[in-house]
């Protein structure tokens, strides 16, 4: 069943409320639904602390809805930065969904994010140019950072910078998924507002969907600080494992934090735990993919690159063989 929102209709752009289940997120919406402030439980936007509150609103016009700065945000602070318009619509529950958007350009770069600030499209639209997009959305429980129990954000969180949002269509759609297991270099990171694309934290898993075919859905369960061990101990594997299906892929990248624990040595506990995940993933009929850990930017005194994770990368290669 499709759910359609047309924001070119006068009066259709309203602030989100839990009672109505759809609308644009502004300061009033966050007062009504404070859980939207929680990282990883909504769109992963966090205003800079010195603004003293939410700094983005929305403005409706004949071409759709665009972001507007809140009174606390000086115009000078937007120089070289972007302000997203954030639309949220509650969904019936867990699953995979197809999202369709219609945008109207403002003569510059455009970025479209879904879920926890996952990049789904970026490009340039000329003034008044209309562009329709389609992409998948994963709605799966996760254990938020700092919490111990799984939580489900059963909603479509969609954010657009540089364009007017004219229409949204949401519908359930079965599709294969790419599950991600890993650490801070993979996870869905928060970004400050106003948004500075070149200097905001982001895991590569946050951008992966932009480069996959449109019928593949990314389900990211990586979190900062995780190891091959704590991914299980923290309850994340208990979410991923039963949801794996034949035809799914599961990408695993650990090492940054395993390296800090003697019992998770590259040729010891690290390899053994990866091997256990590979067996379990294959048992579910899914295809595991080992990813070597991203190396830190460290250098020797004479200016040569110092790869502190080379041993872990070599262990991954050997296990893959």
Model regions and ranges:
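Gly/Ser/Thr-rich beta-alpha loop segments that engage phosphate groups in nucleotides
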Residues: 184, 227, 257
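Compositionally biased, intrinsically disordered or flexible polar/acidic segments
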Residues: 1-189
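Short beta-strand segments
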Residues: 159-161, 222, 253
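Short, solvent-exposed turn/loop segments enriched in Gly/Ser/Thr/Pro and often Arg
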Residues: 222-225, 294
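Structural motif
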Residues: 227-235
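Serine-esterase "nucleophile elbow" of acetyl-processing enzymes
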Residues: 167-222, 237-249
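Alpha-helical cap/lid subdomain in secreted, periplasmic
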Residues: 235-321
